[in-house]
Amino acid sequence: MESRAADDIWIIKFYAPWCSLCKQLDPVWRQIGSELKSLGSPVSVGKSDATASTGLAKEFRVRGYPAILMLKKGVKYNYSGPRTKDGIMDFVNRVAGPLVRHLSSVQLFQHAMSRHDVMLVYVGATSQLKGNYTSVAEELIVHTYFFSATRDVLPKAVSLPSLPAVLVFKDGTYFTYNEERDGDLKLWINRERFPNYFRIDSYTLYAMGESGKLVVLALVDKNTCKEGLRYKSLVEKVAADYREIYRNFYFGFMEEHDYISGLVMGEVIVPSLIVVNLSIDGYFLPQGDVETERHLLDFLKGVLDGSIQCLGGNGIIQRIKRFVYDTKATLTLVSSQAPLLGCFLVSFPLAIFAILCYLCCKARPTMSNDDDDDGVALLAPSLHHRNKPPQKKYD
């Protein structure tokens, strides 16, 4: 940190020696370092033991392990995606490059379209809207790519009522930002930066909480059975056919259920359907079997009109329950992977509690004895006075 140049770009992994997930990431981290070096990338790759370099970890606000952060021109970017080589490399290429990438030809535009499921594009000359767009890009570059182009580069089917404009291309179509209708630009981009239907993992689902939309999920196994395939195709069909009606919904399927298990605080049934409201940590479950498209549409209608109760939430009681559940799940995981550490984490607070109880119990008789002594001391003069023989009077 003291010797780096102002233009240096670093991606750093913060780890703890006892963290099993950090150890699993080690070979991936070495591959990333080797590949970036062979490509001549300006990004330097490093790692830091957060338990030893506590000052550096505090400066980067490391709260969990492994933490992956990027430092570019004094700005720190936190990576919250899957701990895979492809995911991290995409993050590096996105953040290390320009905030807004200019597409100067039809060929470049088509190439970008083929690589990205969602494309945000600014069209027009310099304007206040472009300034806002660039400011949003600086904050949200960790999540998605930002592009700019001239009108003649766009497909001829794209109709723009006026310039400048911001568009999002996804799901085989496009939408144009309208400030009066869509409100704040950043909030609109957060809502629209995901495909309408796609495979969702726990990292993506967590990030979707900022969109403010409900998420319809088909929970399936990795080796999807016939029933799971039926749920997936049902959700995908409704997502495509009723996109305009359910603009406040995202649709997808999940093959990993740890996040949902934590949300409902229990084991989930697979395959099944669930609608989650990530802004309040709530969820909705169908009241019966969902076998047809009409059943799914009735379920979504019940979610919107309030006839189906929202479970969970982020109230105080729910937060306490979820904290207890997460603590138990963490201790179970740690105990299975590091038994000695798990025993210490369980026994240490119990030992402290036992010591406090012992001290309290020991203090009680001492206080009682003191009180008795004080009482005797107060009574003794009175008894002494009462038993004292009367003095005789003499002339």
For each predicted feature, which ranges?
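ER-lumen resident redox/N-glycosylation machinery signature
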Residues: 1-395
